[in-house]
């Protein structure tokens, strides 16, 4: 964890964590991408998909989900032990869409998990290649972040729906490892901890016995991950308090919610990575591109260049706008769901709409949707500029933000002011500064009140032309400060239901 003095780059977390130089990191991330690409090509061959069908993002999602399910040890064990009617624990599958006589047809496929594992390992030189699996999990998580608002989940844990900018990675599975922990937002970590504490309150044995010891160490580990995301001493001290509590209860929940709210202004460090669907890596590999040899980075120009030269298609429902569908997927590809709209409009080079104004539902098609009226179209995933992804929250300051989302979590390391609604955030801090953490609370509130509207974050950082691979000439964009900054503004996005 960052605070433990073991600052490893996120690429190192994706690799084996050995200290590597940039070239080695690029090669090993490239190797991971190669493996995903080779696996995808093989699956398309198995399923006899045409080139067009193989580039359909819905088919990609099904194939990705199958391999993730095949390697989900815990769930597989659970399914073996609790057999449910009509579910074969040894099989996995999903909808595959094919073009037949000028129409899209849905076919439900079923495969042995063992067979899928074999194909995956074969594509990855015999390894389990957990990093490749995590990479796909993060892509699914980024897609969920761009598509759904987690209002219900926030309210259930006693948090406020306006804190949605803190919820990056809230749908990532537990098994996503260090790379997964790096991309989780402050709100996501707080929510996981609150759920844990609530179980402890309701179940006397939760913290006891052999299992309780494991639970306790998981709790402390999560506290440390969250602590590592905070950038101020007072917020970190507060996390120490929560972690050291002998019997975590309502006081800890209060402290956690307080620290989450404070992160709207005193932002945490959250990593951002451009994770693309497997149907982007597959065709690139089959065209002869060698990712391991060329090297690849998830936080630099590489994903932008790859998307410039990729054709990805999507099924479109009758009343959906293909441009809006493209925006949704573009945001997911760059992990930009909580980024400032003004900024990624600039990078993408097209006007970007807030979620509530998008005429598009999620990318996945439900099994009961009528296929007769489905069309397909090309997703426009190209960009005008590229920018380096950030893993810090940027320094903090104010500007008017909106009724829905009241803060941003920056994705790109580009100079701008960071909008949030100070009066709204501060209103949440009335009263309660007593108790064990009162001095920390007072200190945090003081820092928040001192945050200034005119401060600029990521000073001097800019976007780059796509021809500028070495990032030599930063272009610092200028923004209309009066413009709306947040994506979930006054929103009607669907809820995420597992």
Curated annotation (Swiss-Prot):
**InterPro entries named in the record:** Flu_NP
Query: What domain of life?
Result: Viruses
Q: How is it modified after translation?
A: Late in virus-infected cells, may be cleaved from a 56-kDa protein to a 53-kDa protein by a cellular caspase. This cleavage might be a marker for the onset of apoptosis in infected cells or have a specific function in virus host interaction.
Q: Coordinates of motif Bipartite nuclear localization signal in the sequence?
A: 198-216
Q: Which UniProt keywords apply?
A: Capsid protein, Helical capsid protein, Host nucleus, Host-virus interaction, Ribonucleoprotein, RNA-binding, Viral nucleoprotein, Viral penetration into host nucleus, Virion, Virus entry into host cell
Instruction: Return the Basic and acidic residues bias intervals.
Output: 8-21
What family is this?
A: Belongs to the influenza viruses nucleoprotein family.
Please identify the protein, giving its name as recorded. Answer: Nucleoprotein
């Amino acid at each position: 964890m960052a605070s433990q003095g073991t600052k490893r780059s996120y690429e190192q977390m994706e690799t084996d964590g050995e200290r590597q130089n940039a070239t080695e990191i690029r090669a090993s991330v490239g190797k991971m991408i190669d493996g995903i690409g080779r696996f995808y090509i093989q699956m398309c061959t198995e399923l006899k998909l045409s080139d067009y069908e193989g580039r359909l993002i819905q088919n990609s999602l099904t194939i990705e989900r199958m391999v993730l399910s095949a390697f989900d040890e815990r769930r597989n064990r659970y399914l073996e032990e609790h057999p449910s009617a009509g579910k074969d624990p040894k099989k996995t599958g999903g909808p595959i869409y094919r073009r037949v006589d000028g129409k899209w047809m849905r076919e439900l496929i079923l495969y042995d998990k063992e067979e899928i594992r074999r194909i995956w390992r074969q594509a990855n030189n015999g390894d389990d290649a957990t990093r490749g699996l995590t990479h796909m999990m993060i892509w699914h998580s980024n897609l969920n972040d761009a598509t759904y608002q987690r209002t219900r989940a926030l309210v259930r844990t006693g948090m406020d729906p306006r804190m949605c900018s803190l919820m990056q990675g809230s749908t990532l599975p537990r098994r996503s490892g260090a790379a997964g922990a790096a991309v989780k937002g402050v709100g996501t970590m707080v929510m996981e901890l609150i759920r844990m504490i609530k179980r402890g309150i309701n179940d006397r044995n939760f913290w006891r016995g052999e299992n309780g010891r494991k639970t306790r160490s998981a709790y402390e580990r999560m506290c440390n991950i969250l602590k590592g995301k905070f950038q101020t001493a007072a917020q970190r001290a507060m996390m120490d308090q929560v972690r050291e509590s002998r019997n975590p209860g309502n006081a800890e929940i209060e402290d956690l919610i307080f620290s989450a709210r404070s992160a709207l202004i005193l932002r945490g460090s959250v990593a951002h990575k451009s994770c693309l669907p497997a149907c982007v890596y597959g065709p690139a590999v089959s065209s002869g591109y060698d990712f391991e040899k060329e090297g690849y980075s998830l936080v630099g120009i590489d994903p932008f260049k790859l998307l410039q030269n990729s054709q990805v298609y999507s099924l479109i429902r009758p009343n959906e706008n293909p441009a809006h569908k493209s925006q949704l997927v573009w945001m997911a590809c760059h992990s930009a769901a909580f980024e400032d709209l003004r900024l990624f409009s600039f990078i993408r080079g097209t006007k970007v709409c807030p979620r509530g104004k998008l005429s598009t539902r999620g990318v996945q098609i439900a099994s009961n949707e009528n296929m007769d009226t489905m069309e397909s179209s090309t997703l426009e995933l190209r960009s005008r500029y590229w920018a380096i992804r950030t893993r810090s929250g940027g320094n903090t300051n104010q500007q008017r933000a909106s009724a829905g989302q009241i803060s941003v979590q920056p994705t790109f390391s580009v100079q701008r002011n960071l909008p949030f609604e100070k009066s709204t955030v501060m209103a949440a801090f009335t009263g309660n500064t007593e108790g064990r953490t009162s001095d920390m609370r007072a200190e945090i509130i003081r820092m928040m009140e001192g945050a200034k509207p005119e401060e600029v974050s990521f000073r001097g950082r800019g976007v780059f032309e796509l021809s500028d691979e070495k990032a030599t000439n930063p272009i610092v964009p200028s923004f209309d400060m009066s413009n709306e900054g947040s994506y979930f503004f006054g929103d009607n996005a669907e809820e995420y239901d597992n």
